[in-house]
């Protein structure tokens, strides 16, 4: 499982701990463990073509919302799309919002209409 460390920020899952996104390719999901191992935030995706993924759903438990956790998941998923030279269909409203707020060329050129 690949891990991508992110800078610690106020409101991180545990104060002083960086947000660490884990990528489980077999389950096709990105996760952030919260409160030890008890809770987790997740971003789900599926392959819908040979080189096309659908970024389907992002979920952060209510108690952890507003802390930037979904942003880390979205960035990790889009970075994966870029690194693997994939195309992305974005079903998830949050990832659509993330791309709109972060219109980086490397993300925009990979999006399917």
Swiss-Prot record:
Residues 1-16 have a biased composition (Low complexity). Residues 1-20 are annotated as: Disordered. Residues 22-112 form the N-acetyltransferase domain. Signal peptide: none annotated. Coiled coil: none annotated. Belongs to the NATD1 family. This is Protein NATD1. The lineage of its organism: Eukaryota, Metazoa, Chordata, Craniata, Vertebrata.
